[in-house]
A protein has these predicted regions:
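Glycine/proline-rich low-complexity segments that form flexible loops, beta-turns, and polyproline
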Residues: 2-144
């Protein structure tokens, strides 16, 4: 009887060890920051993080809403972003809601940037270059 109990406990221990490292969930990092254009906070918009596969980052594209010049990964579901290298796309709007333009009028052409998201908590502030505001092309959005 004692040997059967020991054998069963041994099997349970081995199974527990085998499955302890099998979680497919990666630990998510937190990132936040300010987005400004011509020295002022961008009223509305979004920052899109696309994994840079060429630099070894895999995963989903993640977008964060800009509100009053700030974005924060904690507002998303799940809250956070996997650590790694990303290509960024930033779009900004004036925040004045009008028909066909849910976030308002576009205030600069979308810009691209790069970012490395470290493990843990980090900040990435973005200053949109003034040149992005020249010859603004109105891009259709999901709201149009």
């Amino acid at each position: 009887m004692k040997s059967v109990l020991c054998r069963n406990l041994g099997c349970i221990a081995i199974i527990a060890v085998l499955f302890s490292g099998c979680s497919s969930e990666k630990k998510l990092s937190q990132i936040s920051g300010k987005v400004s254009f011509k020295g002022k906070p961008v009223p509305a918009g979004y920052v899109t993080f696309t994994p840079d596969v060429g630099k070894g980052t895999n995963g989903q594209v993640v977008g964060f809403q800009i509100k009053d010049g700030n974005y924060d990964s904690i507002r998303n579901t799940p809250p956070g972003i996997a650590p790694g290298s990303y290509k960024l796309s930033i779009a900004g709007f004036d925040g004045v809601v009008i028909p066909f333009f849910g976030q308002g009028k576009q205030i600069f052409n979308p810009i691209n940037n790069e970012c490395v998201v470290p493990e843990g908590v980090s900040t990435k502030d973005i200053e949109v270059p003034n040149s992005a505001g020249e010859n603004v092309k109105i891009e259709k959005t999901a709201d149009t």
